[in-house]
Amino acid sequence: MDGDLPPLPRIAEITRRHDAWLLVDDAHGTGVFGEEGRGSLEHFGMETKEILQMGTLSKALGSQGGYLAGPRAAVELLRNRARSFIYTTAPAPACSAAALAALQVVRREPDLRRRLWENVRRWTSGLEGLGYDLISKSSPIVPVRVGGNRETMALARSLEEAGLYAPAIRPPTVPEGSARIRTSLTSLHTAGDLEEALGAFKKCLQIS
């Protein structure tokens, strides 16, 4: 929800110590983290032995469906035993083709990833410069802490009126008293887009 990174190397140490497997849900990491966009495991430089990585094809890759990657024996076991796989519907061919094409873009166009992280740095710096409290700034998901539900909804409405879609996230999705505005960046946002969005946040500060 907040785009924050867990201490995966430390967690992997614990699983190895107890002869357990580690399952990493990398829904927001695929295509974004790592030198080649392989996700959180690549970001931390971790080996994939006794680690399963799962994720979605619907975020950075812009398609539908999901994936599970790991040692062949483990994947084959799940392919034959996991009810969630056995009883699911196969993805449409067009979605599979779109996901494969997106993976090629991830591999061949690292400039898109660099541009994304430049946008993250520009955006977080701008919000903090305005005095907003950021819960996390380690990913393209940047949540802005507000606190109360009423104040958060009011801010979301004001931003929408200014032409900016930034959803309000409230309990029970997050703990009481920690409602927030969830902002998300892409590599396609221009410097002008970010300046306009920061202007909307600044205007909302003046209104409040």
Please report, for each region that a protein language model flagged, where it lies by residue.
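Active-site core of PLP-dependent enzymes with the aminotransferase class I/II
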Residues: 1-19, 151-152, 192-193
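Active-site PLP attachment segment
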Residues: 36, 42-77
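A short glycine-threonine-serine/GTX helix/turn-capping micro-motif
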Residues: 65, 82-91
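Short hydrophobic/aromatic beta-strand micro-patches
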Residues: 69, 143-147, 184-186
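AMP-binding (ANL) adenylation modules
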Residues: 93, 148, 171-176
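Conserved PLP-dependent catalytic core of the aminotransferase class-I/II
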Residues: 97-165
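PLP-dependent enzyme catalytic core of the Aspartate aminotransferase-like
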Residues: 161-164, 173-208
